């Protein structure tokens, strides 16, 4: 399991992704500003964990192919279609000598299908899901997400839920994941939100509206 963390939450009209920004090699800390959430199109984004070279190369390959599809057909693939293409590509590479060690969460918004969040593991298995995570930190967040997620979740509550998860990770995980970047995609497109870090984690302010 990767010494990284990515989390995803789907709401009624949006999807939110969060990831730590730490880059490490074995037990060596390299830097703390590595972005792991990548823009695939105006309404699709992907968070990845795994081998550093594999995540960059594979994400770039998927992004370029989705852009080529847009040029060829005049429209972007929906999150569901993009997830299917990504899953198939990853599964095909498993059957060759060029296997990518990468797992991901793919999030998107479509005017017809609405918001969509897909969990894709390193073996090419994919599942549409309401909340998910990859990496060590996600082990501490599953019960939190199951308890507090609901189908009417607002963006503000989803962000508070992300902060609750990050706080639990920083309490219990020996690995120092001190900074998390957060992105949301909805009918207005993909945009970056305020990062979650020790400076923004005021324990008293983390409250949910239900």
From Swiss-Prot:
Keyword entries, A-Z: Cytoplasm, Nucleus, Proteasome
Entry keyword annotation includes Cytoplasm: yes
Nucleus in keyword set: yes
Gene3D superfamilies, alphabetized: Glutamine Phosphoribosylpyrophosphate, subunit 1, domain 1 (3.60.20.10)
Listed GO CC annotations: cytosol; nucleus; proteasome core complex, beta-subunit complex
Domain of life of the source: Eukaryota
Function recorded in the entry: Non-catalytic component of the proteasome, a multicatalytic proteinase complex which is characterized by its ability to cleave peptides with Arg, Phe, Tyr, Leu, and Glu adjacent to the leaving group at neutral or slightly basic pH. The proteasome has an ATP-dependent proteolytic activity.
Family designation: Belongs to the peptidase T1B family.
Name assigned to this protein: Probable proteasome subunit beta type-2
The encoding gene: Prosbeta4R2
């Amino acid at each position: 399991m990767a010494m990284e963390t990515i989390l995803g939450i789907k709401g009624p009209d949006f999807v939110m992704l969060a990831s730590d920004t730490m880059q490490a090699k074995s037990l060596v800390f390299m830097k703390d500003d590595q972005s792991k959430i990548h823009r695939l199109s105006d309404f699709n984004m992907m968070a990845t964990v795994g081998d550093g070279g594999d995540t960059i190369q594979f994400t770039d390959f998927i992004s370029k192919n989705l852009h080529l599809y847009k040029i060829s057909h005049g429209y972007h693939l929906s999150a569901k279609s993009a997830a299917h293409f990504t899953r198939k590509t990853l599964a095909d590479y498993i059957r060759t000598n060029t296997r990518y060690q990468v797992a991901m969460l793919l999030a998107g918004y479509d005017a017809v299908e609405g918001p969509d969040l897909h969990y894709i593991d390193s073996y090419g298995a994919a599942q549409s899901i309401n909340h998910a995570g990859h990496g060590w930190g996600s082990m501490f967040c599953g019960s939190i997400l199951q308890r507090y997620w609901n189908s009417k979740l607002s963006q503000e509550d989803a962000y508070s839920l992300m902060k609750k998860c990050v706080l639990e990770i920083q309490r219990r995980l020996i690995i120092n994941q001190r900074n998390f970047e957060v992105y949301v995609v909805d009918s207005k497109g993909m945009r970056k939100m305020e990062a979650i870090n020790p400076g923004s984690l005021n324990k008293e302010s983390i409250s949910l509206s239900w």
